[in-house]
Amino acid sequence: MTWFIDRRLNGKNKSMVNRQRFLRRYKAQIKQSISEAINKRSVTDVDSGESVSIPTEDISEPMFHQGRGGLRHRVHPGNDHFVQNDRIERPQGGGGGSGSGQGQASQDGEGQDEFVFQISKDEYLDLLFEDLALPNLKQNQQRQLTEYKTHRAGYTANGVPANISVVRSLQNSLARRTAMTAGKRRELHALEEHLAIISNSEPAQLLEEERLRKEIAELRAKIERVPFIDTFDLRYKNYEKRPDPSSQAVMFCLMDVSGSMDQSTKDMAKRFYILLYLFLSRTYKNVEVVYIRHHTQAKEVDEHEFFYSQETGGTIVSSALKLMDEVVKERYNPAQWNIYAAQASDGDNWADDSPLCHEILAKKILPVVRYYSYIEITRRAHQTLWREYEHLQSTFDNFAMQHIRDQDDIYPVFRELFHKQNATAKD
């Protein structure tokens, strides 16, 4: 009998293959749950794991069961109401719910709650940013932006059952058994030859023959005790993420912090920028980020001040665009950098300044950037800034604009702006 002993160091992940299969099978339902859950999180907690719930009917398996129709013959215990051959009225189907606490209370029926399970931070972020990429990424001369791709990387002694290499494991098993039994097999071969000689000799040497047979049996038993396969033989296909170099890139984040931006609007803008930051840091290695806050004046700030500063004032959007243009000219040569920008505002701007914003974007910024996205966060009617930007959208293919009304719009708008296109064009 062969015994398999699990000595793997990662024994706690023995069901990982089942988990991965489950995530692949119900990816659509999981992504839907994630898109709903992200809007309920705090601004500082968008990159942790998540409890995902899936409606029971979405994970129910096909099964055979007895139908409710037709005639059936059954034997029931005796009672005071029925006698032999009486027909029993068919019970009405229960009006049960399907769990999850929806609908009115009822005295009948039964159901099941939604299936809830926990996904890790890595699984959460992988699903969150799946199929997203920086648009129009160009291969420039200096390659510092690194995107990671999964490649085969030989074999490893540890892994999940789904990645086991049967051929390599059996090769190791054969080599181990050959090495461990080579000496015994040579000794066995010599004893068998000696036994053959003695068996054919005259007179018979019964005692010597019996001794040889006993030694041969012991050697064969020792050889058979060497296990056919051992945990040391197992080899798994190894995969690793290797850097896939492409062009260097910079992302400009322009946020309106004027007095018209109330705290709720600022929080939605911060949620969008945190998603953008996580997406860039998760997908690419060397993307630089330039943070610009503006009211009547624009200022380049660090990450902490961008998200937490309380400074506010009036509204002149062109101040941020002028500062961005200055920074590009000073530090980011468009011939060597892929330049991106994401601007968030409530659309409230000094009326005479909106045409100036149109002019700066059309003549200075859009000709040198790979992609510029504008997000307007408001429930009011659009004002002059939106209307000026609409003219840009019809003229420039690398300009996109979206409208966010409440938190539920943030993630769909983000995916719409950065969904993967034929984005890695090589000019």
Swiss-Prot record:
This is UPF0229 protein YeaH. Transmembrane segments: none annotated. The lineage of its organism: Bacteria, Pseudomonadati, Pseudomonadota, Gammaproteobacteria, Enterobacterales. Signal peptide: none annotated. Belongs to the UPF0229 family. It comes from the Bacteria. Residues 92-102 have a biased composition (Gly residues). InterPro entries: UPF0229 (IPR006698). Residues 79-110 are annotated as: Disordered. Residues 79-90 have a biased composition (Basic and acidic residues).
